[in-house]
Amino acid sequence: MEYHWILLCVSLCFTFHPGDTKPTITPAGTYVVVSLNAPLELQCQGEKAMQWQREERPKVRGETKVDGKSTLYIPKAHPAHMGRYICLEETSQERASIYIYVKDPDNPFRKSMVSNILSREGDSASIPCLATDPSLENLQLKTCSSKALASGLHFSPSLEQGIIIHNTQKSYEGCYVCTGRLKETNVRSHDYHLTVRPVPVAPPVIMMQAPKRVILIRDESLYLTCNTTNVNGNIKLKWVAPLGSQPAKVDGSSRILTENFTQARSATLHIAAVRIQDTGRYQCEAENEKGVSTQSVWLDVFEKGFMYSNPVNNGTIQVRAGESLLLSVSIEAYPMPRSASWSFMGRGLHNTSDHVITTRSHEYTYSSELKLVRLKMSEGGVYTFQASNGDASVNHTFTIFVISKPEIVSHEGPVDGQVRCVAEGFPAPQITWYYCEQPYARCSQQVNATQEEQNVITVTLFSPLFGKTEVESRVNISRGRFSTLECVATVEGEQAFTLFSISERTISHDLFSPLLIGSVSAACILCLILIVLFYKYMQKPKYQIQWKVIEGIHGNNYVYIDPTQLPYDHQWEFPRKNLRFGKTLGSGAFGKVVEATAYGLANEDSMMTVAVKMLKSSAHSTEKEALMSELKVLIYLGNHINIVNLLGACTVGGPTLVITEYCCFGDLLNFLRRKRESFICFKLEEDCHYRNIMLQREMAGDSLNGYMTMRPSAAGKPSSSSSSEKRRSLREGSPYVEEDSESEMFDEDSLSLDTEDLLSFSYQVAKGMEFLTSKNCIHRDLAARNILLTQGRVAKICDFGLARDINTDSNYVVKGNARLPVKWMSPESIFECVYTFESDVWSYGILLWEIFSLGNSPYPGMPVDAKFYKLIKEGYRMDAPEFAPSEMYQIMRSCWDADPLNRPPFRKVVERIEQQLSDTTKHIYLNFSSRVPVMPRGREESSTHSMASQPFNSAGNNSPPSRPLLLHHEVFLEGTEPFRVQRV
């Protein structure tokens, strides 16, 4: 027992020796509060060497050591000295600590250089809002906007550590402040912005910029790139090459995306010259905290190029005449074929409406299809597909036999007791003979008919390899008791027949009975009524687009593009729900134009006034097709400042709606008539003062079918000083015209009209027609009623036929079975129904006469009758309108030349009118035409694709017989930069 007490005493001596005692800090306590700029002294006493540390920092300034005691002295304390100070016994690592507060009356929270807090999702985030006074109470975390904290956010407040947010989530991101109460006063820290970086939840996704299989020829270069992203930078990306392949160079790149600090990595494997042994699987591996992802590419290296064909159809095909047949060939090739063609019996085939050739390629597969539309007998034969890529070639042949119906081509008899029947068809017709007692009846369909098989001689007269086989059959007549003999030719289940009368018999019948006569008469009357109704229906005018786009010229004949065949780009589609309709701008027999507000047309927050074309609810399918054709033509033409441009369309989920620019001043004709009283005339050759022009009653009324003006017309005399100043600023470029007052500058209804305005209208219409001509487009109804005006008195050419009732419009005269604007038509259009670019030039001359007569009707006082037509043929032309300068009348006369070839093209007209414009007007037009047009969202890119159109010289064309404008699939949208104006 005494032995145990001795062991216990010894162990206690070793356990509680003086060197293991904990250091002591003076002053005592858990914390010390020091005033701002006051001295601070801390002493640490221990058995051995002591050292001061501050929050794990190994060194602290101001420390002195003497005989196992370490003193820390700070002469002027400030908030930067706040924190936990640790006294460490260097040998035993025993420690004691104390927290120092430095009271700052102006800053209840220590100022921090850190305002942006970055944390990983799932980690804890520390907001370093340290209190300078331990008496601060109710330390809380709030958002800077005083909104409620995010759902699920938990935090721990501490005067020494600030606020610790636990398990941070992406939804916690935002601005936070620390608040508390100090001496009955609410205090708050400065703002802290918390950013939470997400952590991956799955292995990375690899995007490969290469097909699953890559084929190369020896010594070609190999580039394989794989990409991946990760929410942080802890990701690895590498390539693994197959065994036996040559060393490959791998280039890597890394960048941080602005979205959520996502890091994007890419790795590119490069072999400058591949070898056969490089064939194999190349694997890209990406690794993050959640695992590894792989994507692989198989590389095949060949000595030279190859081609392997795989015909979809059998080599020999039979098809009925009139049916269509699709021949398909699929090729695996590398490189892709340089040449591929179809031929028929050794003659090359081209893409036509009867032979439609379609080619497709994907990676290393090339396919070609030949569609034979409604095969004819003459199209039976051998079709061959050939392709080559320089290293290899393929040749595949299809043998096509066209099955035709049987046809009795000749028959004779009975002659000398024998009848003869000749039939043709493919395959060779099978001829059979039948006897029956019924006269003039098909014996083969009778129950008691007899088939003749013994006395029949059948021979083949003609049997080409491809085409109809001609077969002759003869039969000896030996059965006098039968009255009818039938020859039946059969091919593939189809029959043709002819009947022979064996003996002449008088058969009584009541062919012309009263009942039969009455039935035939009623049928004839009914047919006559149907013919009349059909004629009346065909005479009824139908809606069609006036603008015609030329595809080619054959001699002096035009070939127009079928607008139904033009493509419709669905990027022009606009949601119906974003349209709010207003008043009707114009209404006609077929449809109407309605003012509407489009929301989100240019951008998501935009609101734009537009004009919407639509058909009436009673529209027929042909009229719906015509409106769709007009939409496709507008897409094809593209944008120009002097035509009414397309903005969008609604073709899905309801009736077709065509959305175009809204022209606030209506049509030019009514605008000119409305401005007559305030017109200011000045001519180059004489002085002319302000005039009031009395409205002629027959011209003063607004057109019944015109485009409604959406701004109030000026009343009284608008020649006030303010109008003069506005006009002067518009013409001379004074500082009155500001970008911020653009709407005020364009309030043109309050301004008068002068000769410079008329020249501007003439110039703008000529520019628009020059653009349409460059697109090989003929207008066919160019007149002031089809010119609209918008802000800034910008003239825009349109086709307003949809909203005009030509049956009630006196400008359209009945000629044949159509209503035509005869007074605007050229002689060749009136007498020969020929519409050309030059006929549009003639109509433009009439339009000039309308402009400089301020809206008078052409050929005033002359009805359209036989005398009118005679005068036009004899060369009668109108005199100069009252307000036309001499040069403008000379342009009119040149437009009215009897020889279409002598009429100036619109390019020359533009040059001549531009010489008469003032520099101010030119400058204004250049400003307008150089502006970027308002394009709907998503159309800018699509509008960059254009079809290269080359204008034709229409009249008296001496070119080769055919000059196609559109080659098969080369129909695209009009390109960008339609608003650049070249100055002459």
Curated annotation (Swiss-Prot):
Localisation: Cell membrane
Catalytic activity reported: L-tyrosyl-[protein] + ATP = O-phospho-L-tyrosyl-[protein] + ADP + H(+)
Transmembrane parts of this sequence: 515-535
One annotated GO molecular function: transmembrane receptor protein tyrosine kinase activity
The EC number(s) this enzyme carries: 2.7.10.1
Ranges of residues in domain Protein kinase: 579-926
Protein name, per record: Mast/stem cell growth factor receptor Kit
Gene: kit
